[in-house]
Amino acid sequence: MPISKDKLILILGMVCLEQGHSETLSSIRNPDCGQSLVKPQPQNYFSLFSRIVGGSQVEKGSYPWQVSLKQKQKHICGGTIISSQWVITAAHCMANRNIALTLNVTAGEHDLSQAEPGEQTLAIETIIIHPQFSTRKPMIYDIALLKMAGTFQFGQFVRPVCLPEPGEHFNAGFICTTAGWGRLSEGGRLPQVLQQVNLPILTQEECEAVLLTLKNPITGKTFLCTGSPDGGRDACQGDSGGSLMCQNRKGAWTLAGVTSWGLGCGRSWRNNARKKEQGSPGIFTDLRRVLPWILKHIQTGHRRKSTKALCSEPDGLISGSEGELHFPESLHLYYESKQLCVWTFLVPEDMHMLLNLSHLDIESCHHNYLAMYSLEDRLVGKFCGENLPSSILIGSSSIRLRFISDATDYATGFNLTYKALKPRYHPDSGCRSLTILFEEGTIQSLHYPEDYSNMASCTWIFQAPNYCLIKLSFQSLEIEENGDCSSDYVTVHSDVEKEKEIARFCDYVIPSPVLSSSSVMLISFQSDENGTARGFQADISFISRADLNISISEDESVPLETWDLPPGAMEIFDAERDTHTKPPYEEDIGEMPAIDSGLLKQGERRGKH
């Protein structure tokens, strides 16, 4: 049974340290990091047990690295300055892109109800969410980096916190501090002035034991907990993304965690297993797992450069019988934000083209992608993610690639090779590579008229002119008989999402012709591990809608085309359904097919599990 949303409150998650990065870290560390001009109050028993939930106000300037992430001047989440351009926050604060892309970051903030001297507000240029974060398990790797569109000017009220040094860690029992503008009690009011609370770190064994008592137990090796079994002090809603900070031996404040989550606010977890209303410690994600990731991005963010070739010349031409393209020029570089790069590939006339991607690292298809066009500027598909697709056979002598990136993410781009092939099209080519064709033709199963092999997987995409529909006519059909056509079968879709299946065939009876409902038809053939037969052969023809007396509305939407995707491998763009903000330089290119970068391993299919 999942934890109900009103009980699971995302508020706390820790970052600790991995050894072996002293030179790297010292090269980027600000010598004035972790320095506050406000002396901390002496700790006693009562100040130790103060809390944000009903806790104490912070004197202005006490934690100059604390920032407020705001949407239309309303506080949404906290964050922590680690350099003049970089802020750390919680990944779950950035999970909703519609909100994330509208946020501004205010440093030097103290009282939310008024503008104060020393405040600085910057827009966000780049959002980088940890790759292992998932909204389905938001307590894992709940961390994100924000690159500012500008730089903070350091002074009395704006300074960076320190990142931990190699070998530096804070043992169980160490008292650390978290601050924020979160609720003063569970379900209570929001403060206007920054609050703080001191929290002891728990042992790993106690942390794991408490989490296993929950009705929906939580496990993982990334956790570190804070708090007291009797509760009473905690972070709460609105504190997400803020800092858990500890003073090191030199007195400098060091970032030990990022406010992420907890069960309730300040609840007791003593005798938790027998309680109806359970509680949890404040949970932190182990920084030893994410510090190298942080360092990689804040370093490369200062020096990364994409290739200048062709990006400044949108109609850049690459011609010849074969060649390659690396973008950026080195795998160790990252592509820049706000890019619009266009390449036109030309192989000799009357030749076709085979593309192979040897490297692919492009963020979400909503914001960063490589789009492919062919024949009269017609879109073939778009690529993103990290899983490499099979080779792609294009029935054309020219192709245009357009790469677009926005200001939210970056990655290492792509490498591809191209080669001209004589247009000796084989009807079973869809079993050797993803085959995209723009002309009528014949298709057949692998080895036809001999028996097809076990675990075969074949895919053809036909794209007719917009004024045409596509007709599939079988010449023969001999596929292993099974009652529901779930073992060996041919499927026909009028969209590449495979959401609009218009036919499914098996058995030994030649069916009637199939007519698509759009100018796109995807045909796939699959076989399982048991039994084979002769297979099939079919003809593809284009039929004018006018000949069929079918009218076309100017507002008619061509179905979005894509494949079923492994989770996280690709995303789908749909101009009507997409709620994300378009990249700054993205053109309105209408309905787009999205190419699956992980699914199309032609010729062999894995068994069912």
From Swiss-Prot:
It is an enzyme of class 3 (hydrolase). InterPro entries: CUB_dom, Peptidase_S1_PA, Peptidase_S1_PA_chymotrypsin, Peptidase_S1A, Sperma_CUB_dom_sf, Trypsin_dom, TRYPSIN_HIS, TRYPSIN_SER. Glycans are attached at residues 104, 356, 415, 530, 549. GO terms for biological process: fertilization; proteolysis. Its main location: secreted. Residues 1-22 form the signal peptide. Disulfide bonds join 77-93, 176-246, 207-225, 236-265, 311-341, 365-384, 431-458, 485-506. Keywords: Calcium, Disulfide bond, Glycoprotein, Hydrolase, Metal-binding, Protease, Repeat, Secreted, Serine protease, Signal, Zymogen. It is found in: Secreted. SUPFAM superfamilies: Spermadhesin, CUB domain, Trypsin-like serine proteases. Belongs to the peptidase S1 family. May be required for sperm ADAM3 processing and consequential sperm fertilizing ability. In vitro, has an endopeptidase activity. This is Ovochymase-2. The lineage of its organism: Eukaryota, Metazoa, Chordata, Craniata, Vertebrata.
